[in-house]
Amino acid sequence: MGFNIISAAEAASYVKHGYNIGLSGFTPAGTPKAVTPEIAKIAEEEHAKGNPFQIGIFTGASTGDATDGILSRVKAIRYRAPYTTNPDFRKAVNNGEIAYNDIHLSQMAQEVRYGFMGKVDVAILEACEITPDDCRRRYCSDHCAIGR
């Protein structure tokens, strides 16, 4: 079993309006940085056409500007949990533009696993390297694609 290498834009195309996405990372260090700006571009394009485009975001903690900032500014976040520190995101929450659940970080995995947050439609992970051995060991699904 192998894996497909696709562009960040193609990886973002898997994310549709209304989806819930799970993002890796605990602070900006492990958060995806290439795909989320491409999701923001899709949101801008859809909004320019008069179409809705908003997603739910589940993370391990705060993600930084490459996710919470850019997606807040283009009004692409419908729901977000848990903790985050981005000022653009906080402003959008305080203006009633984003539904936010500030649950404790230790509760997030169980909430998602038990289905209390709804299903995760797409997971986007930051990775330094994925090797063919990783895929042979089944660390990658049959639908694994790498966005660069």
Q: Positions of the model-derived regions?
A:
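Conserved alpha/beta enzyme-core scaffold
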Residues: 1-148
